[in-house]
A protein has these predicted regions:
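Active-site-proximal specificity loops/subdomain of glycosyltransferases
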Residues: 115, 119-168
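GT-A fold catalytic core of metal-dependent nucleotide-sugar glycosyltransferases
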Residues: 157, 161-207
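Histidine-anchored nucleotide/phosphate-binding helix
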Residues: 79-96
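Long, low-complexity C-terminal extensions of enzymes
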Residues: 295-327
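Hydrophobic targeting segments
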Residues: 70-75, 92, 101-104
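Catalytic core and acceptor-binding pocket of nucleotide-sugar-dependent glycosyltransferases
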Residues: 205-207, 223-306
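Membrane-proximal basic amphipathic "stem/tether" segments
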Residues: 1-61
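Short internal beta-strands
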Residues: 101-108, 202-203
Length: 327
């Protein structure tokens, strides 16, 4: 099966069918995997919980304008994730008096409808739309020079958290995954946001890079730290070497095929060359268990894998109900 999949991926890539292959193969496969994990009836419950969360996001009271230096927080988002983005940023804003500002980078599906839904809750939001992104990428990452990065971002939207947010821009940027919620002030994260000096990241429950340490270390030229999670990622945009990233991305695919965790692996390779600011693992929980989901003790939850049902069933409701610190 693995061999068949890799051959199919190869020919889809050669024929320029990256997006179509992703939709026709990977998305149905993801559905089957989820069905096997939680059962078909529970998938229906999950879909109901997601719709309930989406309606709740649209009904959140608007965030009031704040004073002080603006501190931008970036998300890649669109039609499928806008409400998760709103809840994540909203929960962060509730935990600080700093002038945090939402920046939503269009994943290609951020129509006027979803822009308006986000803006009614986060009135000061700034959108970076697909037309602007495409123009910028054509200027700084032209297809003829960066064919792998450009084609890969079409088939693999996660890569846009690198290309679309950072290419052709300057300065430090904090990028958060949308499937996270804050329950207490994230002191270390806010300290970094106020004065970024080195890249930052959070710690995963396991190492998930998609490629062998040997290949990654050979490409990066340094040992690769384990368990980097890109739910929290702070990078300096103008410090990224896009020729190098093109080489890394192309070589990984040529030698080991494409992988869902490639973006996390590439960022881990970038982080490996720096003395990074690692968010303290005791402050947050990646993939919280049922008890923690129902009664949060950590500052932050990152709801990956098996914790998704709890996120949609319980997590966001803590924000709506005005979660209070049990301590």
């Amino acid at each position: 099966m693995t061999s068949l999949t890799s051959h199919a991926s190869h020919w889809a890539k050669q024929l320029g069918l990256g997006v179509a292959f992703y939709r026709l193969y990977h998305q149905p496969r993801q559905f089957v995997q989820r069905w096997r994990r939680v059962g078909l009836s529970h998938l229906a419950d999950l879909a109901h919980d997601q719709r309930q969360m989406e309606r709740a996001a649209a009904a959140l009271p608007p965030l009031a304008p704040r004073s002080g230096p603006p501190l931008e927080v970036y998300y890649l988002s669109g039609r499928k994730f806008w409400y998760q983005t709103v809840f994540c940023f909203y929960s962060l804003a509730l935990q600080t008096d700093l002038n945090v500002q939402l920046v939503v980078v269009d994943d290609g599906t951020l129509s006027h409808r979803y822009q308006n839904l986000i803006r009614q809750v986060c009135p000061t939001v700034r959108f970076v739309l697909a037309t602007e992104i495409e123009t910028r990428l054509n200027a700084v990452l032209p297809w003829e020079r960066y064919p792998t990065l450009r084609s890969r971002r079409e088939a693999y939207p996660n890569l846009r958290k690198l290309t679309d947010i950072h290419a052709g821009t300057t300065g430090w940027k904090l990028v958060l995954d949308s499937d996270m919620l804050f329950f207490r002030p994230p002191t270390a994260l806010l300290d970094w946001l106020k004065n970024p000096q080195t890249p930052c990241h959070m710690v995963d429950v396991e190492t998930s890079y998609g490629y062998s340490p040997a290949l990654m270390e050979r490409l990066a030229g340094v040992p690769i730290p384990e368990q980097i999670n890109v739910g929290i990622t702070g990078l300096q945009s103008d410090a990224l070497d896009w020729d190098e990233l093109e080489h890394w991305c192309r070589t990984q695919i040529e030698q080991a095929g494409s992988h869902y965790y490639q973006e996390q692996g590439l960022i881990a390779m970038l982080m490996a060359r720096h003395d990074c600011c690692v968010m303290p693992p005791e402050d947050y929980i990646v993939m919280p268990g049922p008890a923690e989901v129902i009664s949060p003790q950590a500052q932050l939850h990152h709801y990956v894998a098996e914790s998704k049902p709890g996120y949609f069933r319980h997590g966001w409701k803590h924000i709506v109900n005005g979660y209070s610190d049990p301590t």
